[in-house]
Curated annotation (Swiss-Prot):
Gene name tied to this protein: OLE16
Protein family according to the UniProt entry: Belongs to the oleosin family.
GO biological process, one term: reproductive structure development
Function comment: May have a structural role to stabilize the lipid body during desiccation of the seed by preventing coalescence of the oil. Probably interacts with both lipid and phospholipid moieties of lipid bodies. May also provide recognition signals for specific lipase anchorage in lipolysis during seedling growth.
Modified sites of kind N-acetylalanine: 2
Family matches, as PANTHER family: OLEOSIN (PTHR33203), OLEOSIN 18.5 KDA (PTHR33203:SF25)
Primary subcellular site in the record, as a coarse category: other
Region named Hydrophobic: 54-125
UniProt membrane topology term: Multi-pass membrane protein
Location within or outside the cell: Lipid droplet; Membrane
Region entry Polar, spans: 2-53
UniProt cross-references to Pfam families, sorted A to Z: Oleosin
Protein name: Oleosin 16 kDa
């Protein structure tokens, strides 16, 4: 019966479910139990973990190295096969590529300007609906300054017209 409990880690004086100093359950660090010397166990674990980490890293690194070599070889073969075709068709492909680039730039520009127009219309709707969008205060201030300057110019023009008629 004692051997049965020793295998379960109960013999060391701790109860099942009680964590010992080595991080396991049941073994409390008593050297009379199943684990042998606790310090020796702690030293072996990091060495084994380092070896396991090194093996995992070597496996992952090796497979990535093999994959990168295969991709490089495939790229070289593809360029070797495609170069004569590109040289033969370059009088057609270069203008086609330029046309595609210009059309793509046109579509992107058109889309960007469309988004800008929608955002401006949205801002104007919010402003006219009285929802006070960002920048509405600046617009109101600029509108007031412009109206003030227009009044000043109108008054100055009226004064000059009256002076010209009176003279």
């Amino acid at each position: 019966m004692a051997d049965h409990h020793r295998d379960r880690g109960v013999l060391g004086g701790g109860a099942l479910g009680e964590r010992g100093s080595h991080g396991g359950y049941g073994y409390t660090g008593d050297h009379g139990g199943y684990g042998g010397d606790d310090e020796q166990h702690q030293q072996k674990q990091p060495v084994m973990m380092c070896a396991l980490k090194a093996a995992t890293a070597a496996t992952a690194g090796g497979s990535m190295l093999v994959l990168s070599g295969l991709i490089l070889a495939g790229t070289v073969i593809a360029l070797t096969v495609a170069t004569p075709v590109l040289v033969i068709f370059s009088p057609v492909l270069v203008p086609a590529a330029i046309s595609m680039a210009l059309m793509s730039a046109g579509f992107v520009t058109s889309g960007g300007l469309g988004v800008a127009a929608v955002s401006v219309f949205s801002w104007m709707y919010k402003y006219l609906a009285g929802k006070h969008p960002p920048g509405a205060d600046q617009l109101d201030h600029a509108k007031a300054r412009l109206a003030s300057k227009a009044r000043d110019i109108k008054d100055a023009a009226q004064i000059r017209v009256e002076q010209a008629q009176g003279a």
